[in-house]
Structure formats: structure tokens, C-alpha cells
Amino acid sequence: LSNYYIIIRRFYSNLYGREGYLTWTLPASPHAIILSKFVGALVASLYCLFLLFLSGFITILVMGAVIGQDLSPVFSIIAEAFSHSIAYWIIVWWIFTTASGIFLFYVSIALGQLFQNRRGLKAILFFFLLCIVLSIIGTAVNPLKDSYAVGSALVYGNIDEFGPNFIPGLIYEVIKIVSMYFTIHYISKYKLNLQ
């Protein structure tokens, strides 16, 4: 949660807050400014995700040492999971959904800037409205929506064949990312009104 708070706060204050006057007078295009904020946020989010998995790994090691049991079967299960292509599809899925989530925060803040007063409140309202609408649309292309197919893939061992089910979801995420990016760019370039 603190990572998201930092991402939101830095984007808002650097582009639409008091620092916005300085940011928009830099000799850089709006594309460069928005992409620099996005890349920084994406790297920070993926780093936090990596640290989460690393801490889980260390916790398993410490648990094994404390209880005095060999936890090598746990590591063999993890290694076996990464031998399937589905693990790589899930990693790519996480990267795209993380990027989409960051742009969702950014586009909500940008849409809130279209109003003269109570911009923060309107940004929060846009966030919840966009979450509802995008979630309804996203259920149609969610790769894990068919629980029978997931269960069958796990039971019968053909989990590698399940990977291509991620393609419609990834296309949807790319469409969301591109549309939100250009919405942010348009608002920042043509409708920017710093107060």
C-alpha cells in the first residue's frame, strides 16, 4: 500500500501540484515526462513484488531451520512450477496488470484535473468508476475465468496448454494501457490547468 501511495503522491505533486509549474517548463515533451513517471513507478512496483517473493523464500528457509525439517520438497515443487510455460505467462500477466494499474491511478488523477474545484475527490470518484467499468469488461477476457478449464489443466497435467488462454487478457491489458496513456497525454498537453 505504501508503494501505491508514493506512486500516486509523486505523480500528482510532480505534474499537477505545486511542482507542476516547474515540471511542465522543463525542455521535455509530455511523452517523456509521463513515461519517466510511469517507468519509475513500474520499476518500484516490480521491485516490491520481487521483495515480497524473496521474503517468502527467506521465511520458508527460516521455518525449515526452526522446526528442524528438510523443506527441500517445497523447493522442488517451486522449481517444477517454473518448468511449465504457464509460470512465464503468469509473470508476463503480472507485469502487464501492474502497468495497467499504474496507468489507472494516473488517468484517474488526470481526469480529476478537468474540474475547477475538488479535484482530488473527483479523481477518487473517477478511480472507482473506472475500476467498476474495467472490471466488468475484464471478466470477459480473464484467462482464469473458466474454473473447469483451470481444474482440468491441473488434474490432467496439461497445464502448458493453458498458457495461450492469457493472450486475450494480455491484448485487453495492452488496449487499456495505450488508451489510458493517450488520455493522460491529451489532458496533460491540451487541458492542463494548474491552480
Regions found by a protein language model. Name each.
Residues 1-19, 30-195:
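Hydrophobic alpha-helical transmembrane segments of membrane proteins
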